[in-house]
A protein has these predicted regions:
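Flavin-dependent oxidoreductase catalytic cores
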Residues: 1-123
Length: 123
């Protein structure tokens, strides 16, 4: 809710004053009647507001498992960094497939060098 978000932003300012250099914006489940807008990249607008009002770099992991959503969140300024959690657990080669989907040249080099060399040479 708005009051809790305002309190969180104030807390983020205090963390920054204490030396914090990156804040992970997440959602808590301590409010039983919270209306959480589940969906792809749903934490983006909240993280962007925290970033802007607390003037601190932010990351989030909620709903950014699709490579294009993650890229857009950074390009648009919603996030400074996307934390990929569940997608990496489901596929340890997520970074490779994300790089391919986003058209990264030499996408195999998101993997360790011995694997990248093999993939680039034999695929």
């Amino acid at each position: 809710d708005e009051q809790t978000l305002a309190e969180s932003i104030e807390l983020a300012r205090r963390f920054k004053a204490g030396g914090l250099d990156l804040l992970s914006v997440s959602v808590g489940f301590s409010t039983p009647d919270a209306n959480i807008p589940w969906g792809p990249a749903f934490m983006g607008p909240v993280a962007e507001r925290v970033r802007r009002e607390a003037d601190i770099p932010v990351t989030s992991a909620w709903g950014f498992g699709e490579p294009k959503l993650a890229e857009e969140a950074v390009k648009s300024g919603q996030l400074d960094l996307v934390s990929i959690g569940r997608a990496h657990l489901a596929d340890p080669h997520w970074a490779y497939f994300a790089a391919k989907e986003l058209g990264v040249e030499k996408s195999a080099w998101t993997l360790p060098a011995p694997y990248a060399h093999w993939l680039e040479r034999y695929r």
